[in-house]
A protein has these predicted regions:
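A residue-level marker of the well-folded mature domains of exported/periplasmic proteins
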Residues: 2-7, 12-13, 17, 23-318
Length: 318
């Protein structure tokens, strides 16, 4: 009987211990401590087929090498469920820092909160992510303004334009807002079509083709990123309108640089982003948080510059 009683007591203690341990890792438990140093970095990108995110991956590797850390880059393929699973995997792997370009800035919040409870620093890049410790992104309103200002300038302040929109994330909404800010200041300009692409060249081609079919009297097209803008270029050339329609984008990608240098292209300008710099700054901000020096502002905006045919040879690029 003593042996049985002792066994029951041991099992009871084990059960209580297991329950307490589970409680500490639940949503209601105390958060784990922040890391002492950054040794493992998890980078989460929206769509690796976009050269923008390849450049971001390169920046992550460079930033990690400087501090002796490792990186693990995950491609969401524009799927929120993938990003939720990737964050849970990073928690299990014990990463110290997650740098995320969120597919859905609100939908990803519960997963970010799980990561933070596990003691992981989370920095959003390119677009905000609710719950992140900070966000580093291009001044997207400024980028949209610069690109559309140049487009309208090239049209002489008069004409019909199309907007090639994208997925509904903050940075893309901001670029469209920037463009519309400029349109409102130019009464000779009219937006006659706006459709959302999937942020890539193929869908940029498809939606621009649809809009040009519906409204062929167009003089300019703004693509909210370079892949969609270059898709618009293909659509313009397919209808043999390269001589009368001009196109601008946002990114300053290597592909857009090549297009600016191509003779006869309707592509005339792009507002820059610096994806590698976003990640470098994310690592610096995370280190500051570890050192007890969080950023004064949790949203850090990187200025955008305009690149045209006239200035492309001076542009450093990605």
């Amino acid at each position: 009987m003593k042996h049985i009683a002792r066994t029951v007591a041991v099992l009871s203690v084990a059960a209580v211990t297991a329950f307490a341990s589970a409680a500490c890792t639940s949503g209601d438990g105390e958060a784990a401590a922040k890391p002492d140093k950054i040794e493992k970095i998890g980078l989460m990108v929206q769509d690796m087929s976009n050269p923008f995110f390849s450049a971001m991956d390169k920046g992550a590797k460079e930033a990690a090498a400087k501090i002796g850390a490792t990186t693990n880059t995950q491609d969401a393929q524009l799927d929120l469920a993938n990003q939720n699973n990737q964050i849970d995997a990073f928690i299990q792997q014990g990463v110290d820092l997650i740098v995320i370009s969120a597919v859905d800035e609100n939908g990803i919040e519960p997963a970010i909160e799980r990561a933070k409870r596990a003691g992981i620093i989370v920095i959003a890049v390119d677009t905000p992510a609710k719950g992140a410790d900070a966000v580093i992104m291009t001044d997207a309103v400024q980028a949209g303004e610069k690109s559309c200002e140049y487009l309208i300038q090239q049209l002489g302040g008069k004409g019909n334009i199309l907007l090639v929109d994208g997925t509904p994330i903050q940075t893309i909404r901001d670029r469209i807002t920037g463009c519309n800010n400029v349109v409102r200041k130019n009464p000779g300009i009219k937006v006659v079509g706006q459709q959302a692409s999937k942020n890539d060249r193929a869908s940029g081609l498809a939606v621009t083709t649809d809009m040009l079919t519906a409204t062929p009297d167009v003089q300019g097209i703004f693509g909210m990123n370079d892949p969609s803008a270059l898709g618009a270029v293909l659509a313009v050339e397919q209808v043999k309108a390269a001589g009368r329609i001009k196109v601008t984008g946002v990114d300053g990608s290597p592909e857009s640089v090549a297009e600016l240098k191509r003779t006869g292209s309707p592509f005339v300008g792009t507002a820059t982003q610096n994806p590698a710099e976003m990640v470098r700054q994310a690592v610096e901000v995370a280190q500051g948080i570890i050192d007890g020096k969080p950023p004064a502002q949790t949203t850090i905006l990187i200025p955008s510059e305009l690149v045209t045919r006239d200035s492309v040879n001076e542009y450093q690029g990605w």
